[in-house]
Structures are given as C-alpha cells and as structure tokens.
Amino acid sequence: MLYSSLRSSLLANIPHSNRFVIALSGGLDSRVLLHLMGRFIQENPQYQCDAVHVHHGLSVNADKWAQQCLQWAFEEKITCHIEHVTLVLGNRISVEQQAREQRYLALSKHVQQGDCLLTAQHADDQLETFLLALKRGSGPAGLASMPESTTFGISYHLRPLLQVTRQSITDYGIAHQLEWVEDESNQDQRYDRNFLRHQITPLLHQRWPGIRKAVSRSAALCGEQEALLNELLASHLSKALHVDQSLKIVELGSERIGKQLIRQWLSLFTVLMPSQAQLQQIWQSVVLAQDDANPQVCWDNHQIRRYKQRLYVVKQWADISLFQQKCELNQACSLPEGLGTLVLTTVKANGILRLPQQHEIVSVRFEPEGIEAKPQGRIGKRKLKKLFQEYEVPSWNRRRTPLVFYNDRLAAVAGLFVTEDFFGEDCDLDWLCNS
C-alpha cells in the first residue's frame, strides 16, 4: 500500500527526472522513504538515487546518526553524502528556522538541474503546518501549507508521502523491522510543532477522525487560489519588474494590487515573506514616501529600500565603516561582509592608476564621511556624498563601496572613478564583488 502510493506519486509528478535525492535525517519518516526508494530503484534501474544527511551538530548523538544513515543507505545500495552545517544559537532567528534554511541550502548542493529532491513529510505534518499557519494569521499562501510537488531552484521537490498518515509509516517501519534514530528534540514541547503534535492534534483526531483529509483539501484550495491570483497578476508583475530585479513603484497601481505584487516580487528572492502588518508598513512607509525620503522597513535580516522610484530588497549587513585593510600590489585584498576581493594589478599600458610610490601605503576603507574628491577629468572637488548621488549609487551601498587610499589620500572609488592626482596607466583596479 505504502509503496504503491510512493510509486504513483513519483511517476505522476516527475515524468522527466531520472535522478532522485533523498533528504535523509535518519528519523522514522525519511528512514521509511529510503527503504521504499531502495525497492523503487531496484525495480526501475533507469533511475538514479542518492541520499543526503545534514549534520546540524545540535545533539551529542549527531555523529552516530550520520554513521547510521551511511550504513542504512549502503544497505539499500544508495550513495549517502554527509553535509555539516553550523547554526548560530542565541540570535534573533529561531533554531528551527535556521536549521530548516541551512538544511535546504545544504541539500541544494547535491540537486542538479532536472533532479528531484524527495522529502518525507506526511499527512500529519501537513495538518501541523496548516495549524501553525493559522496561528500566525496567514493568508491563502501560508494556508496552502506544503504542496506535493513544486520547484526547487532549477530542479524539483516532491513529497511523495504527503497523503500518507504517520501511523501508516510507523506500521511499515515495524513490519519491515527497520531501525531509525529518535531525535530527543522531538519531545521538547517548547517548540510549537512538537506542542501541536503531542497536545493538540491527538485531540483533533479523536474528535474529528477525518480532519487530515479535510485540512488537506483546504490547503489544496488555498494553493489553487494563490496560484490563480499569481497567474492573473503575472503580466502586471512583468511590467513592474526592472531589469535589475527592483520594482517600479509607478506600476504598482492600487494598494490592494500593489501589495500583492510586492508579495509576488519578494517570492523571487530567498527571504521570509513579511507579515500583513509588515507589508502594510512597506506600503505606507516606503511606497508612499516622499521622493526625497530615504525610507526602509526591516525584517528577517533584510530591508525594503526605495531609490529612484523603485523598490529594492537589501540584505542587512554589519557596519564596516571602521574597516581598514592594507593592500599589496598584485595580491587580492579580501573585503568584509560579502564584498569579495579587490586587487591592484600592474599593467604595461592602458591602466587607470599610477603606481604607488615607495613611501605610499595602499589601503582600502569604507567610510566616506567628510571626504572630498576630484575625479579625473572633472573641474573642482566635491563631497563624496554628492559624487555618489551623481553616479547614482543607492544610499545603502555608499558605505559598502571600497575607497582606495595611497597613505591618507583618496586615490580611487572602486567601480566609479580615479581621482586626478592618482590617475595613470600603470595599474588596473579590479573589484570582484560577491553580493
């Protein structure tokens, strides 16, 4: 019964994939999925299958679990890869959210174009997800919960056990004498999902035995409504989207349509969707702001900013205004906070900077406050703030643009200009930025 359900889901949803990647935690659900896929691959040798175990390091048993997953995958003739991730405890992002984000990031390293990621969520997980969305006051997108099949970057993500109950999976594991790991954190009812699992859903099942199917139908209907809305607004979003992925404010239309377009736009990025209150704040404080204002709304380590009548999604970076790094000729200088590297390279001709003299130390900094500069070919000096405006550098990037100094004199602003006193043909300045 369980195998038949999995096989039908695989063949119905992924007709063009020939490689599967199992997210293998080692718990009951993924352990059963591994066993089922072992049989599927044996009966269908035209398909390939790997497994990935993500080692979070949160439990003293984590190393043991990883070894067990390797052994179980070996028994099924499936190659298993171990991915180690590090979580930051005590920050604003919950351990649950961090673990989920890091887990999918680790899994993505093993899923290539056209592959299919398999995860073992089941009908009881769907019920919990729906209840958590209700608790948050989610709209149709959140209440749609987990789709059986969706995209995963340039590949696919399938949950082939989503219509199966937890009890059916347990019965299968026992019947086939499978072993699995028991994560002690699953008993910790400080986590919302565990509280629901142990305290709430048993009562719901007792009162309404058909609640899993009812919730599954409601989630599917919400998903259909959200998909329909996105389809109807797709051409509107395309018109509002700038080539740099910013959003043109003038194309947003009414508040009702505009806020939905902002949600669709944000779905293009790897950010947590803002709450209704945050979305309202984005509309009131950023979209409707005066043209000369510099508004921002922060959430989930990101910001919504406005510049030149367009909206931007900007990551919240640490302050690097005090950063100062000495640079050597022809050696890459590492920059902080995802800004990549900067290298001053000697060339025979057609460079942009003169060579530093013997007594001149080359350094890179980021604090533009109070600095004046005269770009090569310009008349008169101007404050860097004014020059950044002329060069149309958004305000949030002005303290993230490398300033190259010879001793304590500004020689160049990476990517923009060289100052008059330091112009020459001896060196090139290359900024390879990651962000």
UniProtKB/Swiss-Prot annotation:
Record keywords, A-Z: ATP-binding, Cytoplasm, Ligase, Nucleotide-binding, tRNA processing
Source domain of life: Bacteria
GO molecular function, one term: tRNA(Ile)-lysidine synthase activity
Catalytic activity line of the entry: cytidine(34) in tRNA(Ile2) + L-lysine + ATP = lysidine(34) in tRNA(Ile2) + AMP + diphosphate + H(+)
GO biological process, one term: tRNA modification
Main location: cytoplasm
Record's function text: Ligates lysine onto the cytidine present at position 34 of the AUA codon-specific tRNA(Ile) that contains the anticodon CAU, in an ATP-dependent manner. Cytidine is converted to lysidine, thus changing the amino acid specificity of the tRNA from methionine to isoleucine.
Protein's name according to its UniProt entry: tRNA(Ile)-lysidine synthase
Native organism: Photobacterium profundum (strain SS9)
Keyword Nucleotide-binding included in the entry's annotation: yes
Coiled coil segments of this chain: none
Keyword RNA-binding recorded: no
Location(s), subcellular: Cytoplasm
Amino-acid positions noted as binding ATP in the UniProt annotation, renumbered to this chain: 25-30
HAMAP family: tRNA_Ile_lys_synt
